[in-house]
Amino acid sequence: MVIGCGGVASVAVHKCCQNSGVFTELMIASRTKSKCDALKAQLEGKTDTVITTAQVDADKVEELEALIRSYKPDAVLNVALPYQDLTIMEACLRTGVDYIDTANYEAENTDDPQWRAIYEKRCKEKGFTAYFDYSWQWDLNDRFKEAGLTALLGSGFDPGVTSVFSAYALKHYFDEIHTIDILDCNGGDHGYPFATNFNPEINLREVSANGSYWENGHWVETKPMEIKREYNFPQVGEKDMYLLHHEEIESLAKNVPGVKRIRFFMTFGQSYLTHMKCLENVGMLSTSPIQFQGQEIVPIQFLKALLPDPASLGPRTVGKTNIGCIFN
């Protein structure tokens, strides 16, 4: 069962359907069933996978639980919003189904007093201020173990493949790894003045936040885009890349013994950065609700409605990406 039907979900479903021998049956479930139906229609006649669709509100554990019990999947792939990780994990625990996701939990309402108290305590203890971290999901580890279930977190490319690269390098090439630099270069061009490659709300919150890296057992935090490097990426060329906080730093620091420093860099063009800074300066990246003409809206969610749908970018994008790790 795939929960979510955005850009990442579309890619995941297409890849599953290219492997029909493994994924013989597949349900796509999302808040908007028409999007699931449209994705199913794209694949009709192109795959042997039997696809069904359903509507579900991933914020509601009871709805998720009922749908999972009805369909009885072997595993749930969560490619919805990171805000919904905990509700989907809870539904998997209640139904005895394995869980997979691509991004760690992040709170939607960062002004919620209960969440804020836990968040501020974590900031003091860990030393970074990102709104997303693994602690919320790692707290469920014992429950998944006791139920005999697997929860595979961060199973995209970064995090995901980059973590596999790191584990493989440690097992086969190095006695010790002292430093890991993860480099993510998007050399593609979609032709728009400004767009994001995945959910704009998540993407812009991540990029506009403080950066951080792991060094000598501690977190070191930086201002947004403070650390810039140039790198000549194979098949892409020279690009500017910037240090960001990214979730696999947290998991690699925990699981790579003896590592002294872990950093994450991502490339951005000047047009992207200029647009983002302008939007931030006028308050459009805010997650706090405001009143507008008698209605409550969240600025960054309103912005999301104006920007191109990430799921529409694939057919019009040309170029290459280059993602990998540098070990010492």
Each PLM stretch: what is its role?
Residues 45-60:
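Rossmann-fold cofactor-recognition segment
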Residues 1-7:
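Conserved N-terminal Rossmann-fold NAD(P)-binding element of oxidoreductases
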Residues 25-27:
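Short beta-strand element of Class I
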Residues 82-198:
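Glycine-/Pro-rich loop/turn segments that contact NAD(P) or position catalytic residues
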Residues 171-328:
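C-terminal catalytic/substrate-binding lobe primarily of soluble NAD(P)-dependent oxidoreductases
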Residues 56-73, 80, 84:
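Conserved Rossmann-fold cofactor-binding substructure of NAD(P)-dependent oxidoreductases
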Residues 31-35:
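Helix N-cap at the beta1-alpha1 junction of Rossmann-like dinucleotide-binding domains, i.e.
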Residues 9-13:
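N-terminal Rossmann-fold NAD(P) dinucleotide-binding loop
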